[in-house]
Amino acid sequence: MEARTTARVDRPAGVVLALFALYFIWGSTYLGIRFALDGFPPLLMSGARFVCAGGVLYALLRARGAPKPAPREWGASALVGTLLVCGNALVVVAEQWVSSGVAAVAIASMPIWAVIIAGLWGRWPAKLEWVGLAVGLCGVLLLQGRGDLRASPAGTVALFFSTLSWALGSVWSKRLPLPHGPVASACEMLCGGAVILVAAVIHGERFAAVPGPRALVSFAYLVVFGSMVAYSAYAYLLRTVKPSLATSYAYVNPVVAVGLGALLGGESFAFASIGALGLILAGVGIVAAQRGG
């Protein structure tokens, strides 16, 4: 009886810690990316981040007895990982021209695109889900119309394809034979990061100088906390709580990113942009509620 009681106490504590990691760590990575860009080329930084995180996590999991993925599972991980890591890399590219807060607000529309893409596999939105899609898209249009994105066409294009790539990878991950548990995240990060590193070399990216202390600390933070810790927390939540709770980070990350950008990054955020954030999150919330977890 005592063991059962302890398990019941430990599980909620673990869920709270995992949610904290997703809400605040992933929300803070937008500002971390901006700081890391002071010393790292965008694609090199993204690729190295995920190769380092995936390699260390994979080695730790294998040392603890996790099974070696089959070739078929590696292939699925390469496809999903490329889409997800490419989505993240495009955020890094976009943050060369837009603020971390604006990038986070734009990326908050990702679940909306995921619902649309899921319709291609036959799961079209219900009536209220269409309402959520319309509300969320109005938020994106408001953000664009105010000029936060319009002032940077390159940043707008990068963020648009970032949301599509991440959404496609998320939807596809449910239909492919990925490895079991956290090993899937490690394999995805390894494969996706390697693809981005190749793209960086082809693009001719080079270090103009040795990265400064702030850029190095930010990069280390992205590797350890943004990738290893947060991805592990996400995998834990997917195993223990409803998907609607596990993916609720999409509602909180933009708020954290906007706040940190204003407090620590000296970024400004207009009232109209806050309205856009509210519309996007309302739309995502309606869709999530209709999906019923």
How would you label these PLM feature ranges?
Residues 54-57, 113-116, 120, 133, ...:
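Transmembrane alpha-helical segments that form core, pore/gating elements
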Residues 2-47, 82, 90-93, 147-175, ...:
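Glycine-/small-residue-enriched transmembrane alpha-helix faces in small-molecule transporters
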Residues 57, 78, 84, 109, ...:
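Hydrophobic transmembrane alpha-helices of multi-pass small-molecule transport proteins
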Residues 56-68, 110-131, 255-274:
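C-terminal transmembrane-helix exit sites in multi-pass transporters
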Residues 11-16, 38-47, 69-75, 130, ...:
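Juxtamembrane helix-entry segments on the extracytoplasmic side of multipass membrane proteins
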Residues 2-9, 50, 215-217, 251-293:
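C-terminal-most transmembrane helix of multi-pass membrane proteins
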Residues 46-48, 103-109, 172-194, 223, ...:
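Helix-helix packing/entry segments at the starts of transmembrane helices
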Residues 25, 29-33, 58-107, 140-142, ...:
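Specific transmembrane alpha-helical segments of multi-pass solute transporters/efflux pumps
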